[in-house]
Design a protein with these regions (language model features):
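Domain-edge interaction signal
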Residues: 1-140
Length: 140
């Protein structure tokens, strides 16, 4: 069993705070990409709001802003199910990774009305991420 690194832990803690649910390491099996899409868009939206989850660069993808570096990180998380479970069960360690980020994440969640769209969160964050990316890179 290999331990999670700093960026993996920060991503997992931010995911739970942003979406109100835990990252699912099995979501990508059988070609389902929703967990990765949600996390890609969440990290991009947080970065645009001044909350840096990792040092990721984004470019346009057919599903909106995409970071190859973040995909590598997410795939490494997917292979560490036991470590992910252990991290989520350790409230003290989770809190350490959210220090100074909670209020910013909560404020963004509220502004983006994440709770209203939990049933369609993948599509909602895709739309929000895409609009944000286009408004910052394409439109004057």
């Amino acid at each position: 069993m290999s331990a999670l690194n700093f960026d993996q832990k920060k991503t997992l803690a931010a995911f739970e705070r942003f979406f109100g649910s835990r990252y699912n390491t099995h979501a990508e099996e059988n070609g389902n990409t929703s967990m990765h899409v949600e996390t890609q868009k969440m990290c991009y939206l947080l970065k645009m709001a001044g909350v840096e989850i990792g040092d990721f660069n984004y470019s346009w993808n057919f599903r909106g802003p995409f970071s190859p570096g973040l995909l590598v990180l997410l795939r490494s998380i997917d292979r560490k199910e036991a470590d992910v479970t252990e991290f989520y069960e350790n409230a003290e360690e989770k809190e350490k990774f959210l220090l100074g980020l909670k209020s910013k994440i909560d404020e963004l969640r509220e502004k983006l009305e994440i709770d209203k769209h939990l049933n369609q969160k993948e599509q909602w964050v895709e739309i929000l991420g895409s609009l944000t990316y286009i408004s910052r890179t394409v439109l004057p």
